[in-house]
């Protein structure tokens, strides 16, 4: 961690805990700040607040008292999940108190260079691939950010010889100021989080902030398969490298089934361990970032031919009596399920789908389901999905949840079939998180092996 004194004796409010808020509070406390933490969860149920109190940090829990901001704070570190129209945030901004997120703090304390990855889909897989490749190459890469490892906590421990490989959400990027990654990567840009940002333009503007402090000495990696991303190349001061499955570009690309970086042959596209065009894009993006950090081809090939996927993200679980089973519980929207389906032969595929009903239809999914062998539906959207399947003459069965769906569909399947959980819906009708949904599916798989 850098030896910085700017926070010493400064009164700082950390708004919202969870892991990132707790990490920020501990880092700031170590840097000599006078830290106050405010979180809405009652103290008795708030493990993070209890730990911080033991560290001598002032904690205020159970509500967000607006008069707390009368204490003349020099800075607010906001949990990224808290919206900017929150009364506490609005009051802080009215008082000219700077509001940042924890990734800005991570940048300020980090001695290590940062690879920042953002975008709508593919962030976690691409982030993990990059870190795995660099580590396979003998380098020291540290996963951090929106991937489950608080950025400031990892940055605090990182050395100058490490590389921070940081997954970044639009929520996190809205709260940066001086944040400047050495390499930034935008996987793609689609419609998402409009309930938070208010518009697609605001969402994309938040993502675009990843490069706002970069110079020509830094690198921005863009997806030239997407025209929207291609047009961004002229709007940055950073040096742009691209990836594409459709044409030769300045970074990584595919030509006649072969993957190249610039003019250098890397490997056959067919050797990739993960199925689907979207995972080919993820692999190309990871190759560009890894090559920019000096990774050798051997490390790239080793990882890309053996990578089993990130948990709950088109994760290959194994076989049950000759049937392959995949867990894609992270597919919480139609687009994610469309991308998953693109990697399989529909004629041998059974799709397990359903979940929270957000009021939308599934018409956009119909073309992707042509010739599907069968479906199992569950959750609030079960009836909508069943009607769609019947319209397309797809055999369809209803089940209570993901665990029963797998058990009940097995007698309908044949050797050589593939079973894919890719719900196309959020999990909150039956589960707290998509992780819980996926874990129960994994448990069902293990019980049937």
From Swiss-Prot:
Record bears the keyword Nucleotide-binding: yes
Binding site for ATP: 119-125
GO biological process: cell division; cell wall organization; peptidoglycan biosynthetic process; regulation of cell shape
SUPFAM superfamilies: MurCD N-terminal domain (SSF51984), MurD-like peptide ligases, catalytic domain (SSF53623), MurD-like peptide ligases, peptide-binding domain (SSF53244)
Pathway listed: Cell wall biogenesis; peptidoglycan biosynthesis
Gene Ontology molecular function: any one: ATP binding
GO CC, any one term: cytoplasm
One Pfam family linked to the record: Mur_ligase_M
E.C. code: 6.3.2.9
Subcellular location: Cytoplasm
Top-level taxon of the source organism: Bacteria
Tagged with keyword Cell cycle: yes
Keywords: ATP-binding, Cell cycle, Cell division, Cell shape, Cell wall biogenesis/degradation, Cytoplasm, Ligase, Nucleotide-binding, Peptidoglycan synthesis
Gene3D superfamilies named among the record's database cross-references: Mur ligase, C-terminal domain, Mur-like, catalytic domain, NAD(P)-binding Rossmann-like Domain
Main location: cytoplasm
Reactions catalysed: UDP-N-acetyl-alpha-D-muramoyl-L-alanine + D-glutamate + ATP = UDP-N-acetyl-alpha-D-muramoyl-L-alanyl-D-glutamate + ADP + phosphate + H(+)
Residues forming coiled coils: none
Family affiliation: Belongs to the MurCDEF family.
Function of the protein: Cell wall formation. Catalyzes the addition of glutamate to the nucleotide precursor UDP-N-acetylmuramoyl-L-alanine (UMA).
UniProt-recorded name of the protein: UDP-N-acetylmuramoylalanine--D-glutamate ligase
Gene behind the chain: murD
């Amino acid at each position: 961690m850098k030896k910085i004194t700017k926070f010493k004796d400064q009164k700082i409010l950390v708004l919202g805990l969870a892991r990132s808020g707790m990490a920020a509070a501990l880092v700031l406390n170590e840097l000599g700040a006078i830290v106050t933490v405010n979180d809405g969860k009652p103290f008795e149920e708030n493990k993070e607040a209890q730990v911080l109190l033991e560290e001598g940090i002032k904690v205020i829990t159970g509500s967000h008292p607006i008069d707390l901001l009368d204490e003349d704070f020099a800075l607010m570190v906001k949990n990224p999940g808290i919206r900017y129209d929150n009364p506490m945030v609005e009051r802080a901004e009215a008082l000219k108190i700077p509001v940042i997120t924890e990734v800005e703090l991570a940048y300020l304390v980090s001695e290590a260079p940062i690879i920042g990855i953002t975008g709508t889909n593919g962030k976690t897989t691409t982030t993990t691939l990059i870190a795995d490749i660099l580590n396979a190459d003998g380098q020291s890469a540290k996963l951090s950010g929106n991937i489950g490892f608080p950025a400031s906590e990892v940055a605090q421990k990182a050395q100058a010889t490490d590389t921070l490989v940081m997954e970044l959400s639009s929520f996190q990027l809205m709260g940066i100021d001086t944040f400047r990654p050495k390499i930034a990567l935008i996987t793609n840009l689609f419609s998402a989080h409009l309930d938070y940002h208010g518009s697609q333009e605001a969402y994309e503007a938040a993502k675009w902030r990843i490069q706002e402090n970069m110079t020509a000495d830094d690198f921005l990696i863009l997806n030239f398969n997407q025209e929207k991303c291609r047009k961004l190349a002229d709007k940055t001061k950073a040096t742009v490298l691209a990836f594409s499955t459709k044409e030769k570009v300045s970074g990584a690309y595919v030509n006649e089934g072969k993957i190249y970086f610039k003019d250098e042959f890397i490997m056959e596209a067919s050797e990739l361990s993960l199925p689907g065009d979207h995972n080919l894009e993820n692999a190309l993006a990871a190759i560009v970032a890894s090559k920019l950090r000096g990774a050798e081809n051997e490390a790239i090939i080793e990882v890309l031919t053996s990578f089993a996927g990130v948990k709950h993200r088109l994760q290959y679980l194994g076989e049950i009596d000759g049937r392959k089973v995949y867990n894609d519980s992270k597919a919480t929207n139609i687009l994610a399920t469309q991308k998953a389906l693109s990697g399989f032969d529909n004629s041998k595929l059974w799709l397990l789908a359903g979940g929270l009903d957000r009021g939308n239809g599934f018409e956009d999914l119909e073309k992707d389901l042509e010739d599907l062998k069968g479906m199992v539906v569950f959750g609030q959207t079960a009836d909508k999905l069943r009607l769609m399947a019947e319209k397309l003459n797809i055999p369809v069965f209803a089940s209570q949840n993901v665990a029963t769906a797998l058990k009940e569909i097995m007698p309908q399947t044949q050797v050589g079939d593939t079973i894919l959980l890719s719900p196309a819906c959020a999990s909150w009708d039956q589960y707290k998180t998509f992780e819980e949904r996926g874990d129960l599916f994994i448990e069902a798989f293990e019980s049937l092996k």
